[in-house]
A protein has these predicted regions:
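Active-site bordering "gate/hinge" segments
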Residues: 1-230, 237-240, 246-249, 277
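Dual-mode signal for accessory low-complexity, basic/Gly-rich regions
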Residues: 36, 40, 208-309
Length: 309
């Protein structure tokens, strides 16, 4: 179990912040809190005023508890052992609640708690190559996990076949969800950030400027509702769902309080780094069983590594 606390002290346009780890001893934690506040009070007068400091002074309230029942660890391990019989499997399973809280002297208070699990594993072939797979969510489904493990087992068999060298050229390709996730993660490096867009540093600059567009089937949202992410930012601003890309066109952008002050915008609950916390890509209509038939002689790309700009 891990817990940490972030304290921020603000006065006369100045702000100071301190983060420290909490333990299981209330008396010790209270002493750490008192010492942290004292340190912040000494530091604050020494700092320069922040011209883009913007505080949310509303007394908003937010409370969400997603208390889904997670399976017992023995049950999970038994199913993994049953499904992985005869396989060289190495993985990490993590499960439990994730909690986030916020409180301000203006009277704002937010609490978010959600249970989730994540099983990340690799299946190794005798030739040293491996298939990486993952199963995560908030409700464990034995049938869904068995299917995911069976798919990984089938992919493992292909690693034993002779390698095929591809000549440079254009190929019809299918990108599996794990590969798309890598691309989406790279786009989060300032892609939807109001600050990056305002300073012309966003990888999606042409999209948001209207000079380019994606396929109309592409819609991406910041889907905070029902997600593992809280409905409030670390800056104390309530957040809601945003339509970042709708039918291939750039729409909403992530705006933190600082960017709102600097570029005369309205903050919409983004954290200071302005990266998505609950990115959701709209689903298509291609069934899993139809992928290879639709792909034909094209390339099936299960994952991507080391992406960069």
């Amino acid at each position: 179990q891990q817990a940490s606390c972030v304290l921020k002290l603000v006065k006369d346009g100045r702000q100071a912040e301190l983060q420290f780890t909490l333990g299981n001893d209330a008396d010790v934690d209270q002493q750490r809190l008192a010492e942290a506040i004292g340190q912040l009070r000494q530091t604050l007068p020494l700092l320069e005023a922040d011209p883009y400091l913007q505080l949310n002074d509303s007394a908003w309230q937010s409370h969400s508890v997603q208390d889904q029942t997670l399976p017992e660890i023995d049950q999970v391990l038994a199913q993994i052992e049953l499904g992985a019989g005869g396989l060289d499997l190495v993985g990490i399973y993590a499960a439990g609640p994730i909690c986030r809280g916020f409180a301000s002297s203006f009277g704002a208070f937010g609490w978010h708690q959600a249970n989730s699990f994540n099983f990340d594993w690799s299946l190794f072939h005798s030739n040293g190559q491996a298939v990486k797979a993952n199963y995560a969510g908030q409700q464990w489904n034995s049938d869904a996990f068995a299917l995911r493990l069976r798919q990984a087992r089938e992919q493992l068999e292909y690693l034993g076949r002779p390698l095929k060298t591809l000549a440079p050229g254009e190929y019809r390709a299918y990108l599996a969800p794990a590969a798309i996730d890598e691309i989406m993660g790279m786009l989060c490096w300032g892609g939807f950030s109001a600050q990056s867009l305002a300073t012309k540093n966003s990888p999606l600059q042409r999209l948001y400027a209207g000079d380019a567009r994606l396929n109309p089937l592409v819609s991406i949202a910041e889907q905070v509702s029902g997600s593992l992410s809280p409905a409030f930012s670390d800056e104390g601003t309530p957040r809601s769902d945003l339509r970042l890309i709708e039918q291939g066109q750039g729409l909403d952008r992530l705006i933190c309080a600082r960017s709102a002050a600097e570029f005369e915008l309205t903050a919409n609950g983004a954290d200071g780094h302005e990266s998505p916390c609950a990115l959701s890509l709209a689903a298509g209509d291609l069934e899993q069983s139809d992928i290879l038939a639709r792909l034909g002689t094209g390339l099936y790309i299960s994952n991507l590594w080391y992406l960069n700009f």
